[in-house]
Amino acid sequence: MEQFRGTTIVCVRRNGRVALGGDGQVTLGNTVMKGNARKVRRLYGDKVLAGFAGGTADAFTLFERFEGKLEKYSGNLTRAAVELAKDWRTERALRRLEALLAVADKETSLLITGNGDVIEPEDNLIAMGSGGPFAQAAARALLDNTELSAREIAERALNIAADICIYTNRHLTIEEM
C-alpha cells in the first residue's frame, strides 16, 4: 500500500514571537486526498504549538503522546520532547511511526524525530517535509533581508514552497504566540 506523504511545515521566531505554519495537502501516491488538513495545532492550554510532517495517523498518535508528556512535566517543552523521543525510539509500537514533529513555546523551538533526535535550531528556523528545503531557503532570506514579522515570514515561505513542491498547497494554517 502506498504511503500518505508530503507536506511543508515551517516555524519562525522573530522579535519575541513564534509562528508555526503548515499547508493542508494530504497526498496518497500521486493523488491529492485532502486539501484542507490541519497539520498545526495548539496544545497544553494553547501554550505550545505543534506541527507534523509524515503519516497523518502516526502524527495524531504522537500529538497525543506529546501532550501527555507536557502534562506530566508541567509544560516543560524540552523535557517533554526528550521523553517523547525516548519513547518513540524504544517502544516497539511507536518505533514504526513515520512522522516528524516541530514544537514551540514562547522560548524554545524543537524538531523531534523518531530516531530519538531533539534538535533546537541555531537560526530561529525549522522547516520540514517535502517542501521544507524551499520554505527554509525562503524564510532564511526573509529573516536576513526584511523586517517582516514571524507570521508574515512563515506565510510567505509556505507560499513559495507551494509554488515549487507538488506535495504542498496554499491552504495554510498558521498559529502564532
Swiss-Prot record:
The keyword Hydrolase applies. Keywords: Allosteric enzyme, Cytoplasm, Hydrolase, Metal-binding, Protease, Sodium, Threonine protease. GO terms for molecular function: metal ion binding; threonine-type endopeptidase activity. GO terms for cellular component: HslUV protease complex; proteasome core complex. Its EC number is 3.4.25.2. Allosterically activated by HslU binding. The active site is at T7. It is found in: Cytoplasm. One of its GO terms (biological process) is proteolysis involved in protein catabolic process. Disulfide bonds: none annotated. InterPro entries: ATP-dep_Prtase_HsIV_su (IPR022281), Ntn_hydrolases_N (IPR029055), Proteasome_sua/b (IPR001353), Proteasome_suB-type (IPR023333). It catalyses: ATP-dependent cleavage of peptide bonds with broad specificity. Na(+) binds at A162, C165, T168. Belongs to the peptidase T1B family. HslV subfamily. NCBIfam families: ATP_dep_HslV, PRK05456.1. Protease subunit of a proteasome-like degradation complex believed to be a general protein degrading machinery. A double ring-shaped homohexamer of HslV is capped on each side by a ring-shaped HslU homohexamer. The assembly of the HslU/HslV complex is dependent on binding of ATP. This is ATP-dependent protease subunit HslV. It comes from Thioalkalivibrio sulfidiphilus (strain HL-EbGR7). The gene is hslV.
